[in-house]
Amino acid sequence: MFQREFAMRLVAKPCESLYCRLTVNTRLLSRVSHLLKVGKNNFKPPPKVESSVVRIEPRHPPVQVNFTEWDGLVRLCFSRKNKTLGAIFKQNACLDLLEKNYRTFLQLEASGALQSSSSSAAGGGSADMDIESSFPVKRLGISDLANRSRFKDYVLEVLKDGNFSDRRSSKLAQEDFLELLARFNAAGIHFK
């Protein structure tokens, strides 16, 4: 049993006003359903808020995704949930973070340290690698990162290839977020 507003956030669907980061993260790991509303008068003394009973069932097997990256992507997307993803990923703070992570990724890839760490960090790795290889993207090299607008165009190209640049976070379903993360990872853009 939860406070009604919190319970409604857990069970919200895309395009509803209460759809938020909490909803997306909860649905990644479980199925959530609203069972019943509990009125104020069922308690003594009556509280000032309504309550609801919610069923949360864990998914078996759980989705294979790097939770640190997942949280980073969802956090960025819901920083302003009604802005388009294109506008969110054009912000300087967002681009600074992604460019720093991209440089680190390229350096790890060049040193060969990435192969051993990615399979252990992903919790199995092979499923993630299959998803990433299904979205081939021409990657930028370290020399290409000298021009800031080039990296910005690269990020926006990843969004446009998946038709995400004009979409809003509050309208994306769970599968859309998983596809977006897979597209960014295939392009070498990470959210750690």
Where are the predicted features?
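Class I S-adenosyl-L-methionine
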Residues: 1-192
